[in-house]
Amino acid sequence: MIMSSRSFLEYRAMFALEERDLDGVVLDCAGGASGFVAEAGTRGVRAVAADPLYAHGAAVLSERLSAGLEQGDAMIDANAERFVWTWYGSAERRHELRRAARRAFAADIRRRPGSYLAAGLPRLPLAARSVDLVLCSHLLFTWADRLDQEWHRAAITELARVSRGEVRIFPLVRMGDGEPVPFLGALLADLRAAGLSCEVRQVPYEFQRGARHLLAVTGSRTG
């Protein structure tokens, strides 16, 4: 899987975030090297990130991120027809946002290590309903070729367990080929049968062609 570094601005667009969505505690899972928590902190937003990679030292994180950036760029180059540049405007603008996010993450994890939890799905060391909003970027569904339907069910159920409000997941297509996730419909049926509310919403962001929807999940009230 690729470790990436997306910006606060990208998160706002991908997750259709409004100011009121950021009033409570926000969990970014899996956070990777996203700059979201860092910039959220400068805006007075209470945000934390979770990722198993945070258990490693700065050198390992830097190495993984460098490799991830190279892999991501190579994947984009190899599948150029599957990407839309309207939101970014240019490749350089995307690179600028990613470089700034990477710098913000690197500085913030040193300055505020308590905001970065070394943990991963499908089980988080967090109490039930301990955050107000969960954001999950480019993990669920993105890697559906490696993570099966049962893993997704367990992971989403866990994210809903720790959230008092919504879980927002983006995107809903697979990495690289941008194809629909074959088990999405069956998974949503399973989640709804378990008492979770699931809603697919369009967002004001599209980079991977066809990836312009998020999944919002609410409803878990058990620990």
Language-model-detected regions and their locations in the chain:
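Conserved SAM-binding strand-loop segment of SAM-dependent methyltransferases
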Residues: 112-124
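Conserved class I S-adenosyl-L-methionine
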Residues: 21-53
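Conserved beta-strand signature within the Rossmann-like core of class I S-adenosyl-L-methionine
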Residues: 155-156, 163-173
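Class I S-adenosyl-L-methionine
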Residues: 175-223
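Conserved alpha-helix/loop element of class I SAM-dependent methyltransferases that forms part
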Residues: 3-25, 33-36
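A short, conserved alpha-helix within the catalytic core of class I
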Residues: 143-158
